[in-house]
Amino acid sequence: MSEGIHKGQHLHHIIVTNELSVSRSTLYRYVKKGYMDVAPIDFPRMVKFKPRKSHDLPPIPSKDKIGHHYSDFLEILHSGDYHYWLEMDTVIGRIGGKVLLTFNVSSCNFIFARLLDNKSTAQVVEHLNRIKLDLLKNKLSFSSLFPIMLTDNGGEFADISSIESDDENHCQLFFCEPNRPDQKARIEKNHTLIRDYFPKGTSFDEYTQEDINLAVSHLNGVKRQSLNNKSAYEYFTFMFGEAAAKALGIHYIEPNNVIQSPILFKK
């Protein structure tokens, strides 16, 4: 279906050609809810329809979150086996456009990000798989580096099994309590720093993954009082090595060359 839509084919043509046993309304609904790797903007007829008042993805079913609650997260931390975790979230650009999938290492506030075509479960899983593959190419394991992940209840994170899966093992995904952004306060703080480069309301559509890597590399190069005047890059590479940072798209920025504003992208 996605290939047909990208070719500009009408839904009826796609359904008949591919002998799909679903209705047009069902496919419209799947696209709007983010179940497909396309967005409404990719399908000309859909953008003409009056949108629903709510554009949020459907909530993650409660039964799927059994064993993945914030209380489960606290329990595993209290066991003493883990001393840091990876926070995951999204940063919205213009409504209906590209978004950032962000990650923050709790022990040092090292952040990396991926540019998604849209806010969907399919895009989250696709880009997580790319990250895992990039690490694997460097003989590194995502689940070994980041055994615990914490995120909010956004519907884009609904595919728990795919998010947790890894070639060698699997990581464990947990969800904050509803309306409790303070439970992943580290990544929320870093989001305010990301806005130094991309002010609220900025569209990500004109940016590339290389642009995002550049901005986040500069952010990771900032000296922080909370890190004893070291940078997140220095702490992360001390813990995991420069190869891990490079595999995640992050490179070293000389302190005097660090930029913390949109002028980073001025030609």
Give residue spans per PLM region.
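Secondary-structure boundary/capping micro-motif
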Residues: 1-203, 207-208, 214-217, 222-224, ...
